[in-house]
Amino acid sequence: MGATEVLTSYCVVLCLLQMVALSSGHFTVIGSQRPILATLGGNVELNCQLSPPQQAQHMEIRWFRNRYTQPVHLYRNGKNLHGETMSKYVERTELLTDAFNEGKVILRILNVTVDDGGAYHCVFKDGEFYEEHITEVKVTATSSDIQILMHTPNIKGVMLECHSGGWFPQPHMEWRNSKGEVIQATSKFHSQDKNKLFNMSMVLFIEASSHRNVICYFQNLVTHQEQSINIVLSGELFSWKIVWIMILSTISFVMIDFCMTYCVQQQLIHEESLSTVDNDQCESDQSEGTCYKRNYPWIIIAVVPIISVFAIIGVMLFLHLEQRVTILEQHFELDTLWLEDISVILCVVIVSNINLIPLIYFRLHEHVPRFKDRSPILNKAVVFLHFIYFSIVCGTILLVHLQLRNKVSISDSLFSLYNSWLTDISMILGFLLSIFIVTTIAKSSLFNKKWCIGLCIHMKEAEATGGPCEGEEL
């Protein structure tokens, strides 16, 4: 036997052994080692093949997920058995058999949903022998629908809300400035709809005009796709600061101007009275209880507007720093609206009660003669009326509070806001009541001393002329 015949015999034996091995079902299944990305609503193809390549038409090919008995797609005896597949995959899968001769199959899944994500088992079965390969599918959805909602600017600042829906999986979201630097979000929220898609929302509360260009940024953590939208904030949105500074400055300027004018007037009257009144006589009258030597009136007069300014500043700071609701709560905007309205009302109340009402009162003293001899009674009446007025207001607040307790449940967040406001207003009214009474008494005391000096002058003139002074008034 020659060498050629020996080599030929060896090749024949090797081929026979290979055919025996193939007929006995010795093979492996290979496929993609990386996750397959599937776009939501699109189609995805999963492939696997035999190694070594061989005919697969006579084999059973099964694709399943968690349970072997619940196939996604089943091919057996040369047919696709759709009746044995999972109901949600009926008419949604196709098995591409163009490369059956090479042992390669492709499963196409149509109209991908969020539930299609996960592991898929590809099984080739030849007789009793089978092998499988596992392919992972990741479903992704990226949305370009991003909206920024800007709430009405209020006394505390500007609130921005960024919304975007239709994401999967949950994306990364953040606020950025024009330089790409991250701005800490006030809050972040997310929810899932019936299709298990994520609806994202985040809030940014800007208290100052430091961020003029704000970017709402989203990123899909699987595909690394990015979506963003920006908003440019005008400086006019923060004009509320200038408005409030102008209001407080105007109030302070008016009160200080009134104070200075009135102080100069009273000082001139004081100096004129000192030049005509015998100090010794007034001191003797003072010892008898008929006259009081007047001190410099501008000290008391100057204290009143100063108290007014500090009262306004104190009340405004108290209302603004008091945290009745957090920014994240649904009634935050309602709280800021009430804060704006009540701040204006309190400014008017403080200015009118501390300055306007006493001014009218003292003008009546000067120009209506019958008020002069009743000044002590009127002084007490003013204080009493202040007390009655604030008592009525506090009583009304208490009644409203009791009615709210009966109408609104304790767990209601709106009731908590009402209760906080009622408590704060009650404290402020008590504080203002004490301020009003003190300023009224101070001004009344000043007026009595002024009237006393006038009486001393009149008595001095009556004594010099020899006429009677009893019962006469100035």
Swiss-Prot record:
Expressed in skin, thymus and, to a lower extent, bladder and testis. The chain crosses the membrane at residues 242-262, 299-319, 342-362, 382-402, 421-441. It is a multi-pass membrane protein. SUPFAM superfamilies: Immunoglobulin. Residues 27-140 form the Ig-like V-type domain. It is found in: Membrane. Residues 263-298, 363-381, 442-474 are cytoplasmic. Keywords: Disulfide bond, Glycoprotein, Immunoglobulin domain, Membrane, Repeat, Signal, Transmembrane, Transmembrane helix. Residues 1-25 form the signal peptide. Residues 26-241, 320-341, 403-420 are extracellular. Gene3D superfamilies: Immunoglobulins (2.60.40.10). It comes from the Eukaryota. GO terms for cellular component: membrane. CDD domains: IgV_MOG_like. May act by engaging a cell surface molecule on immature T-cells in the embryonic thymus. Belongs to the SKINT family. This is Selection and upkeep of intraepithelial T-cells protein 4. It comes from Mus musculus.
